[in-house]
From Swiss-Prot:
Membrane disposition: Single-pass membrane protein
Name assigned to this protein: Probable cytochrome P450 514A2
Source organism: Dictyostelium discoideum (Social amoeba)
GN (gene name): cyp514A2
Cell compartments where the protein resides: Membrane
EC number(s) from the headed UniProt entry: 1.14.-.-
Claim: Protease is one of the keywords in the record: no
Length: 500
């Protein structure tokens, strides 16, 4: 009992100290940032209690509508600025302040990966990890069959159809889960060089989903550590820790198998194998043997890559399949474009190098990236120098959020039809055109962008060349999604009707 009283008294004293500091002292960061538009704050908490923890992205977007493209929040003790708009984000992250916004702001709940994994490391260490990944997902390697997209996609169709070649239609249950399992197979092949059985794939799928959903939780103790008791319930409910341990232990076993490969132990660069097919885990292990990265970096970075790539890519694709299942007329246009390019009936061997021949599919991909922003509010960056944005000074050490979802659905930037799904707006545009920002911006942009683009394009061609999709229910499929770190597509079924 005395211990409980001591803890309570300690918390009260800490709160009083923070309150006095907050009311009577103004640190350098707060002094520089104070001219930036901001909602009213309250002592200690700042704007923390105004944040809707269940939908942070929408909450931040509501602030943008009220306070403008550059506004300030004080989340507990953390000075924060939120940026909205393609031009402003492009200026800050790709041009004027590119070198001052390379650093990731590492929250308390992400501290495990600080200076270790690909997502939360900083400086040269981060760019070393990212560089290895980027070198393995070049367009050339992807076009040369590095990930065998076509094979895995066609296998999924056969599995959904119970390998019955004579069947003309079948019902696919929970399409988003089917897409996630498909991409998981591709990513395991890329990162580990293996194909697992269905039971292990299912366990990885379930635990990976738990981790990514939990990563989207708003953690109050990231900003005021004494609020940790408020976070315990939501963190425990998500099974985040047990799921993370499961995935990490699985990868640790796979890394032990890599360590036994003689050509790696002996320092042989290729071991008599095609280096373009080298699994990512082996490339990272070689860096470890050279003393360039830590052992934990291999495991934690592979966890990041598997979970992030599976979740974001699968949700983007699941959303557009839902949309097209509701809209047969768009499917018809896609099919016409495919067949006009498929004189020799060879599109099952489609390659990303052919994508320029499919402008309508590319316009649909671009509109999907815009309308269904896979990561509405990415992990924050941090200013490493004082900067000036849109006339406002922002201090060194400020947490910076990019309001991606708000940027992509705002009428200010996209016109009165911003809330409509309209592929025609990109009719004359190239893939991943300027202003979309769906893969982030600047040096911390997504290194797996080409992976997503290649897979997305390949699946669109193979799916709509071979099948027409129908909604088996009377009500339209709900494609609104649940908000988290990534937009989560809700489960739905679709009827696959084989084309002649």
């Amino acid at each position: 009992m005395n211990l409980i009283y001591t803890i309570i008294l300690t918390i009260i004293i800490l709160v009083l100290i923070i309150s006095i500091k907050d009311l009577f002292f103004e640190d350098k960061i707060k002094k520089i940032n104070k001219s930036i538009p901001s909602p009213p704050t309250i002592p200690i908490f700042g704007n923390l209690l105004q944040i809707n923890s269940k939908d942070v992205a929408t909450c931040f977007n509501d602030f943008y509508k009220q306070y403008g493209k550059v506004y300030r929040l004080r989340l507990g003790s953390v000075e924060t600025v939120v940026l909205t708009g393609g031009d402003i984000i492009d200026e800050c992250f790709n041009k004027k302040y590119r070198d001052f916004l390379k650093a990731r702001y590492v929250k308390f709940s992400r501290y495990l990966g600080k200076d270790t994994n690909i997502l939360h490391s900083n400086g040269d260490y981060h760019f070393l990890l990212k560089g290895v990944l980027s070198s393995q997902v070049t367009v050339r390697k992807l076009n040369n069959g590095r990930l065998e997209f076509n094979k895995y996609i066609l296998q999924m169709f056969n599995n959904l159809n119970n390998n019955d070649e004579g069947s003309t239609m079948f019902l696919a249950n929970d399409v988003p889960s089917q897409i996630k399992k498909l991409i998981l197979k591709v990513v395991l092949n890329f990162t580990l060089g293996i194909e697992e059985n269905d039971d292990i794939n299912l366990s990885l799928f379930q635990n990976g989903s738990n981790i990514f959903k939990a990563a989207g939780l708003f953690i109050y103790s990231d900003y005021l550590p004494f609020l940790f008791p408020l976070d315990i319930k939501s963190m425990a409910k998500s099974n985040m820790i047990s799921s993370y341990v499961f995935v990490r232990d699985y990868l640790a076993k796979k890394l032990e198998e890599v360590k036994k490969k003689e050509y790696i132990i002996n320092g042989d660069d290729d071991g008599g194998v095609d280096t373009s097919q080298t699994p990512l885990i082996e490339s990272y292990y070689k860096l470890y043997l050279q003393g360039l990265i830590g052992y934990d970096s291999i495991l934690l970075s592979i966890v990041d890559i598997i979970i992030a790539s599976v979740d974001t890519t699968s949700n983007s694709i699941s959303f557009i399949i839902a949309r097209l299942t509701n809209h047969q007329e768009i499917q018809s246009k896609i099919y016409e474009e495919i067949m006009s390019n498929d004189i020799n009936n060879n599109s099952n061997n489609i390659s990303f190098s052919d994508h320029s021949k499919y402008p309508y599919i590319i316009s649909i991909m671009n509109e999907t990236y815009r309308y269904y922003a896979s990561v509405p509010l990415p992990e924050p960056n941090m200013t490493t120098e004082d900067i000036e944005v849109d006339g406002y000074k922002i201090a060194k050490g400020t947490q910076i959020y990019k309001n991606i979802r708000g940027t992509l659905i705002s009428k200010e930037f996209w016109g009165e039809d911003a809330l409509e799904f309209k592929p025609e707006r990109f009719k004359t545009q190239t893939l991943n055109q300027k202003g979309l920002l769906h893969f982030g911006a600047g040096p911390r942009g997504c290194p797996g962008a080409r992976f997503t683009e290649c897979f997305f394009f390949t699946l669109m061609v193979l799916l709509f060349k071979n099948y027409k999709l129908q909604n088996p229910n009377d009500n339209p499929i709900d494609d609104r999604g649940d908000v988290g770190l990534s937009m989560q597509c809700k489960p739905y079924d679709a009827l696959f009707i084989k084309r002649n």
